[in-house]
């Protein structure tokens, strides 16, 4: 799969880096580091001109467990964890960071960090479009009902993810106008 992707797209002007993973469940296992290193080396053989990244995330307290895995990447992708970047930079000053997924509501704070620190190179918001799947994320709810939905299995009547800038009918949502102002 990596050969096909890199060889097909390596001359495309919109490709600025390659990703070898996203929120790998087994991220704390030693073989994940070995596999990531092999994948990164292989991608570099196919296209030595672009950096390699993957997206890491956890809400555990042991974020530093990612340091050995992060070290095999040219750019370390942070999903929803850009608030850790400044302390991570103190611990690992050579790390280049890119926010690979973030909440739309955090756009201003994240771009403030991007503009402030040269080691943070950008932010990608999840997601541009609402979509079917991950039912109920991004939904509206009544006070006191915050915990119903995606993380509790209480998905009815939700059918889609409502976290995008554009809804399922193609209309822009208010959050998209907020980001235009940034």
Regions from the PLM with identified roles:
Residues 1-182:
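Extended substrate-binding grooves/exosites of carbohydrate-active enzymes
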